[in-house]
Protein backbone atom coordinates (compact mmCIF):
# COMPACT_ATOMS: atom_id res chain seq x y z
CA UNK A 1 0.00 0.00 0.00
CA UNK A 2 2.93 2.31 0.68
CA UNK A 3 4.56 1.30 -2.63
CA UNK A 4 1.86 1.06 -5.31
CA UNK A 5 4.52 1.11 -8.04
CA UNK A 6 5.97 -2.10 -6.60
CA UNK A 7 2.53 -3.72 -6.50
CA UNK A 8 2.04 -2.84 -10.17
CA UNK A 9 5.43 -4.38 -11.02
CA UNK A 10 4.36 -7.64 -9.35
CA UNK A 11 1.01 -7.69 -11.10
CA UNK A 12 2.65 -7.01 -14.47
CA UNK A 13 5.47 -9.53 -13.91
CA UNK A 14 4.58 -12.36 -11.48
CA UNK A 15 8.06 -13.85 -12.02
CA UNK A 16 9.20 -11.16 -9.53
CA UNK A 17 7.21 -12.77 -6.69
CA UNK A 18 10.18 -14.78 -5.30
CA UNK A 19 12.28 -11.57 -5.22
CA UNK A 20 9.36 -9.74 -3.62
CA UNK A 21 9.08 -12.37 -0.89
CA UNK A 22 12.75 -11.88 0.00
CA UNK A 23 12.38 -8.09 -0.04
CA UNK A 24 9.29 -8.26 2.20
CA UNK A 25 11.23 -10.45 4.63
CA UNK A 26 14.15 -7.99 4.60
CA UNK A 27 11.92 -4.94 4.91
CA UNK A 28 9.51 -6.24 7.57
CA UNK A 29 11.98 -8.29 9.64
CA UNK A 30 9.68 -10.05 12.14
CA UNK A 31 12.29 -10.88 14.80
CA UNK A 32 14.18 -7.76 15.82
CA UNK A 33 17.15 -9.29 17.61
CA UNK A 34 18.67 -12.34 19.25
CA UNK A 35 21.16 -12.62 22.08
CA UNK A 36 23.99 -15.09 21.83
CA UNK A 37 27.06 -16.07 23.84
CA UNK A 38 30.42 -15.99 22.06
CA UNK A 39 31.99 -19.45 22.12
CA UNK A 40 35.48 -18.23 21.23
CA UNK A 41 37.53 -15.06 21.08
CA UNK A 42 37.00 -13.12 17.87
CA UNK A 43 37.53 -9.65 16.48
CA UNK A 44 34.72 -8.14 14.43
CA UNK A 45 35.31 -4.83 12.64
CA UNK A 46 37.97 -3.89 15.17
CA UNK A 47 35.89 -4.84 18.21
CA UNK A 48 37.26 -7.66 20.39
CA UNK A 49 34.70 -10.16 21.59
CA UNK A 50 35.82 -12.68 24.18
CA UNK A 51 34.51 -16.21 24.69
CA UNK A 52 31.61 -15.97 27.12
CA UNK A 53 30.69 -12.38 26.16
CA UNK A 54 27.01 -11.77 25.50
CA UNK A 55 26.32 -10.29 22.07
CA UNK A 56 23.12 -9.17 20.39
CA UNK A 57 22.43 -9.57 16.70
CA UNK A 58 20.04 -6.85 15.54
CA UNK A 59 18.51 -8.43 12.42
CA UNK A 60 16.46 -5.35 11.64
CA UNK A 61 19.64 -3.24 11.56
CA UNK A 62 21.62 -5.80 9.57
CA UNK A 63 18.86 -5.82 6.96
CA UNK A 64 19.42 -2.07 6.44
CA UNK A 65 23.24 -2.26 6.32
CA UNK A 66 24.41 0.22 3.69
CA UNK A 67 27.59 -1.78 3.08
CA UNK A 68 25.47 -4.78 2.03
CA UNK A 69 22.31 -3.30 0.50
CA UNK A 70 22.41 -0.50 -2.07
CA UNK A 71 19.76 2.08 -1.09
CA UNK A 72 18.69 0.00 1.96
CA UNK A 73 15.77 2.24 2.94
CA UNK A 74 14.02 1.75 -0.40
CA UNK A 75 11.61 -1.16 -0.86
CA UNK A 76 12.45 -2.81 -4.19
CA UNK A 77 10.89 -6.08 -5.40
CA UNK A 78 13.66 -6.32 -8.02
CA UNK A 79 16.44 -6.37 -5.39
CA UNK A 80 18.62 -9.34 -6.28
CA UNK A 81 20.68 -10.69 -4.68
CA UNK A 82 19.06 -10.04 -1.33
CA UNK A 83 21.32 -11.46 1.40
CA UNK A 84 19.04 -10.52 4.32
CA UNK A 85 19.41 -12.20 7.70
CA UNK A 86 15.73 -12.25 8.64
CA UNK A 87 15.91 -15.91 9.64
CA UNK A 88 19.34 -15.64 11.25
CA UNK A 89 22.83 -15.72 9.82
CA UNK A 90 22.76 -19.47 9.15
CA UNK A 91 24.28 -22.39 10.95
CA UNK A 92 22.65 -24.23 13.84
CA UNK A 93 20.48 -21.24 14.81
CA UNK A 94 18.88 -20.73 11.39
CA UNK A 95 15.08 -20.53 11.67
CA UNK A 96 13.42 -23.92 11.16
CA UNK A 97 10.31 -22.22 9.77
CA UNK A 98 12.12 -20.21 7.08
CA UNK A 99 11.07 -22.43 4.17
CA UNK A 100 7.45 -22.53 5.32
CA UNK A 101 7.34 -18.74 5.78
CA UNK A 102 8.70 -18.22 2.27
CA UNK A 103 6.24 -20.74 0.81
CA UNK A 104 3.23 -19.20 2.58
CA UNK A 105 4.17 -15.69 1.46
CA UNK A 106 4.83 -16.77 -2.14
CA UNK A 107 1.51 -18.63 -2.40
CA UNK A 108 -0.35 -15.68 -0.87
CA UNK A 109 0.94 -13.36 -3.59
CA UNK A 110 0.50 -15.90 -6.40
CA UNK A 111 -3.16 -16.29 -5.46
CA UNK A 112 -3.97 -12.72 -4.40
CA UNK A 113 -2.31 -10.59 -7.09
CA UNK A 114 -4.31 -11.88 -10.10
CA UNK A 115 -7.54 -11.15 -8.20
CA UNK A 116 -6.55 -7.76 -6.75
CA UNK A 117 -7.65 -4.52 -8.41
CA UNK A 118 -6.86 -2.27 -5.45
CA UNK A 119 -5.98 -2.23 -1.79
CA UNK A 120 -6.18 0.80 0.48
CA UNK A 121 -6.07 1.45 4.22
CA UNK A 122 -9.37 2.24 5.94
CA UNK A 123 -7.98 3.05 9.36
CA UNK A 124 -4.83 3.25 11.42
CA UNK A 125 -2.37 0.37 11.60
CA UNK A 126 -2.04 -1.07 15.11
CA UNK A 127 1.45 -2.49 15.63
CA UNK A 128 2.45 -5.14 18.13
CA UNK A 129 4.19 -3.68 21.15
CA UNK A 130 7.28 -5.77 21.70
CA UNK A 131 11.02 -5.38 22.06
CA UNK A 132 11.50 -8.77 20.40
CA UNK A 133 8.92 -9.23 17.63
CA UNK A 134 8.01 -6.70 14.93
CA UNK A 135 4.56 -7.09 13.49
CA UNK A 136 1.09 -5.78 12.86
CA UNK A 137 -1.73 -6.54 15.26
CA UNK A 138 -4.54 -4.93 13.25
CA UNK A 139 -4.58 -3.33 9.79
CA UNK A 140 -7.98 -2.48 8.30
CA UNK A 141 -8.00 -2.39 4.50
CA UNK A 142 -10.46 -2.22 1.63
CA UNK A 143 -9.76 -4.61 -1.22
CA UNK A 144 -11.16 -4.18 -4.70
CA UNK A 145 -11.47 -7.38 -6.73
CA UNK A 146 -10.80 -7.75 -10.45
Model-predicted segments: where are they?
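Cytochrome P450
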Residues: 1-146
